[in-house]
Amino acid sequence: MGCVQCKDKEATKLTDDRDASISQGAGYRYGADPTPQHYPSFGVTAIPNYNNFHAPVGQGVTVFGGVNTSSHTGTLRTRGGTGVTLFVALYDYEARTEDDLSFRKGERFQILNSTEGDWWDARSLTTGGSGYIPSNYVAPVDSIQAEDWYFGKLGRKDAERQLLSTGNPRGTYLIRESETTKGAFSLSIRDWDDEKGDHVKHYKIRKLDSGGYYITTRAQFDTLQQLVQHYSDRAAGLCCRLVVPCHKGMPRLADLSVKTKDVWEIPRESLQLIKRLGNGQFGEVWMGTWNGTTKVAVKTLKPGTMSPESFLEEAQIMKKLRHDKLVQLYAVVSEEPIYIVTEYMSKGSLLDFLKDGEGRALKLPNLVDMAAQVAAGMAYIERMNYIHRDLRSANILVGDNLVCKIADFGLARLIEDNEYTARQGAKFPIKWTAPEAALYGRFTIKSDVWSFGILLTELVTKGRVPYPGMNNREVLEQVERGYRMPCPQDCPASLHELMLQCWKKDPEERPTFEYLQAFLEDYFTATEPQYQPGDNL
């Protein structure tokens, strides 16, 4: 089974030098592609290794979120003798413009130019076609990134969310980078028993100094692939054998296309509004398509809502905010009526989802998990020194599998309507706003924390308006006098205590979103071990 005792000295090794930052990724070296000679060169002569970005040919650099290409994994030799790393498609992709390339999972590519960041100029070695491809849809041939079971930088909580999605059987699994141990991995498996029902168990995969991998020292392997094969054949002490890799959803693209990456103000006629999803004080939200190919959400703002110049300036910042729990801004039409084009979320706003949708049947564990997702997105906004200013369930969007994402961050600052800018006018969300922000305009990340506490009440009451029976003026007066909402029905006291922490009078005494995320993610698991003991296997 490829045990380390009989391993070849030249076996692939995992590098120890790993950067902990989000941008760097795994930092692996790969063995050679066993079949490079089968691919035609299409008459290419002396193509330099563009996978090295701007580095001189022959110097290995880190690409693809940490892939080190210095070993020329799966290399194609051109007539000039230069090796070019081959990449393989992880998903199907349909071209959105005439500049990009449609492809199917399993197709192999030669990368011609990777200087565009999220979009690479590539040639398919399957079809011979050329065009731009999204870089997060491919991985180096024969790398662990190319394995269906490898999920990379995925946190424990997100691993559990994915594994516990509807339709995954017992034995569904994935491997991810360990959050706690540099150079190690985690194996996460969906399990079931009479006491817990469906749940996830985590096993730490450790790395030997000699380059192998093990969960228990009694079974050691040259590669992660061999480890997976071993535990697919037999449980061998795990909760169950590995049955099927967890389904990977399509990765989100940061842009509509390579053309909108930098010039992302688009013509209004490129958008088709198909179905109205909602109607608010300042405009409407539509499901639509861009370029006749790509489903998007379009927020249309009533003329006069905000200055087009101010909006465009703020949108430049919003476009750079990228996180799994933030709705991605794709493009804008900045002439009035302003259009804001974002990723489409299938279940609409969290408020509508809780009041009238599937959310009515959700139990506390799901509601707390949704709160944890919002806290994770806000923790990112906190790290980026940004402020939301209008955090409430109406501005949280819901997708498949109860995924929650934050929308409309930063827009509230730009609204010019007098009924809003007065801060105590009819259109201003007094009941969600911290007193120092409502009274004195002091909006900070700590006033967002106050709003998050109000959002928690919306979750546990399935969308009930905060401070029932009180109007805006009464709320402002009572809160200033120290009134706080009592514990909602069926809400645990510990969760209400968290709300009260968010509503501290002194903003600096309120918790950080980093703390709120950790508290909520561990709300039901704080007494359980994070990892199963490997040496007991």
UniProtKB/Swiss-Prot annotation:
SUPFAM superfamilies: Protein kinase-like (PK-like), SH2 domain, SH3-domain
Keyword Nucleus: no
Top enzyme category: transferase
Residues the record lists as Phosphotyrosine modifications: 420, 531
Cofactor: Mn(2+)
Any one Gene Ontology molecular-function term assigned to this protein's record: non-membrane spanning protein tyrosine kinase activity
Catalysed reactions, semicolon-separated: L-tyrosyl-[protein] + ATP = O-phospho-L-tyrosyl-[protein] + ADP + H(+)
Pfam families xrefs: PK_Tyr_Ser-Thr, SH2, SH3_1
Positions that bind ATP: 277-285, 299
Residues in SH2 domain copies: 149-246
Sequence positions bearing Phosphothreonine: 12
The EC number(s) this enzyme carries: 2.7.10.2
Organism superkingdom: Eukaryota
Lipid-carrying residues in chain (N-myristoyl glycine): 2
Residues covered by the SH3 domain: 82-143
UniProt cross-references to InterPro entries, sorted A to Z: Fyn/Yrk_SH2, Fyn/Yrk_SH3, Kinase-like_dom_sf, Non-receptor_tyrosine_kinases, Prot_kinase_dom, Protein_kinase_ATP_BS, Ser-Thr/Tyr_kinase_cat_dom, SH2
Presence of keyword Transferase: yes
Protein kinase domain ranges (all copies): 271-524
GO biological process: reelin-mediated signaling pathway
Alphabetic keyword roster: ATP-binding, Developmental protein, Kinase, Lipoprotein, Manganese, Metal-binding, Myristate, Nucleotide-binding, Palmitate, Phosphoprotein, Proto-oncogene, SH2 domain, SH3 domain, Transferase, Tyrosine-protein kinase
Catalytic site: 390 (proton acceptor)
Activity control, per UniProt: Inhibited by phosphorylation of Tyr-531 by leukocyte common antigen and activated by dephosphorylation of this site.
Quaternary state and interactors: Associates through its SH3 domain, to the p85 subunit of phosphatidylinositol 3-kinase.
Protein role: Tyrosine-protein kinase implicated in the control of cell growth. Plays a role in the regulation of intracellular calcium levels. Required in brain development and mature brain function with important roles in the regulation of axon growth, axon guidance, and neurite extension.
Protein name per UniProt: Tyrosine-protein kinase Fyn
